[in-house]
């Protein structure tokens, strides 16, 4: 998990043990923060490999939103760390991936095709209804341990959705499956 400024400039984006977690931001802002410091959001397979050995089907002790990164214990009393030493991959908060997903087919989201102006005057996307541009999330969140794990994915949220249970982590381009 990363800490970052809220201006998408990357000036205070850090990956530090005990850093303040940045959440409640849209996918685009997390991607911009990572790019500002030479990182990218991980790919689906990149996250799966990096998170291997992390806690599976458990979440953070207390099932509460953590304020800081690293050093957490899961509901089974195990340190929440992967075989590669990555902290908080699973059971802390859903983490945005670079990968596109299928749209949410829930009838309440379906609608006509139209252009949606992206926040920050950065262009538009052509999408169907309210959730036609879905990005994958990985790892699981603090409030539902049974859905957490290195291969756990959610394709429910569109990229301009922001809540406390969604965050991001950055990785070097070669480790993200990006050439």
List the model feature ranges, each with a label:
Residues 98-111:
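Cytochrome P450 core scaffold surrounding the K-helix E-X-X-R motif
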Residues 66-71, 109, 114-117, 121:
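Short, charged, low-hydrophobicity "junction" segments
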